[in-house]
Amino acid sequence: MRKIQRITQFSDDNNRSQREHIPLDLIVEIVSSLPAKSIVRFRSVSKLWSSIITTPDFTSSVVTRSLSSRPCVLLIFQKHDKLFFFASPVHQKKTCPNVENFQYTIPNNGKLQRCESVHGLIYLETSTNVMFIRNPITKSFFTLPKLDSKEGRPLTGFLGYDPINGKYKVLCILKERNKIGILTLGAQESWRILSKGFLSHYKVTGYAKCIDGVIYYEGSFGDGLRQELAIMSFDLRSEKFSLIKHPKKSSIATCWSSYEGRLALVSSIASGVSLWILEDADNHKQWIYKHFPSHREFIKERWKLKGVTRTGEFIYTSYRAYVLNVEGRVLYQWFRILYVDPKRNSMRVVMHGGIAVDDIRRLDEVGYDLMKDLTVIPNHIQI
């Protein structure tokens, strides 16, 4: 067991000093049980404490403790190279005056390409092929190391979490069809390149989801002229790939989600919401189809499907960045999220205040479609 030493000096006849040993495991246990704001302050105690707090293993342990708390919906507005993040509580009353928020500016005038939340970490991928991760403990972003240029250019990346070993890994698809990079966070953080054990990647759509230690992503795979749209699964623990037959011949999803602990391809159509749910029946991957009719509220106003909560509620945002009051006046003070429970045939609207009000007003007045670049991430673990 690693130990750190604290020197306690006292006066006696021989001016002796006594060394007291504090087990490192005990320090980790104590600090990880503190509130996030207190943990950040402990970074200044010593270099050792700072190194402990910023490790992925420590982050994983803190996030795991937070799993019992209610998740939130992460809203990300994009204004040029600036990102505005807002954490919206899922189980909230009709109005929520304030939400936790923060901002981030993408370096080199880049644009947001992909964003996902996996076990508390936020993964960002930009148009300049740079990958960032936000540490929920330190509240700061850090850049992932670049791949060696001789291995090829990154096409896209996916963040995953292995709950068995408590490890975060990034899977990077390279433009060279027979190469894939793997980065284990905290393990010297250097890329490993795989060149076998999987089919050639001809195209990756960007749809992806990490569920129970497995990353699922969509693309065109095959050898030579034989290419087909399919879903690739990557087991983060064994680092093995498996090809799963696609339920349809073309990409059908509005979004991907974890539905009752299983991968679901969710589509919003005029008649309602359709789900293709992956069922592991004796390891023979099968798809189950479910359809939920549209709720009556959709007759009055247009809403856009953005995801599914842990409890199976559908998450919608309005096509408009403002609210009309009873007199028909435009109000920018509130942003609305609609939750629809298809099993109970019920719905609720939560109105949030303080969400980029000035930016929404200015951009809307000049015709800038702020809602077009809105990213919504369900089931984010807020620490």
Curated annotation (Swiss-Prot):
PANTHER family: BNAA05G37150D PROTEIN-RELATED (PTHR31111), F-BOX DOMAIN-CONTAINING PROTEIN (PTHR31111:SF54)
InterPro entries found in the cross-reference section: F-box-assoc_dom_typ3 (IPR013187), F-box-assoc_interact_dom (IPR017451), F-box-like_dom_sf (IPR036047), F-box_dom (IPR001810)
Record domain F-box: where: 16-67
Organism: Arabidopsis thaliana
Chain coiled-coil ranges: none
Pfam families: F-box, FBA_3
SMART domains, A to Z: FBOX
Protein name in the entry: Putative F-box protein At4g09190
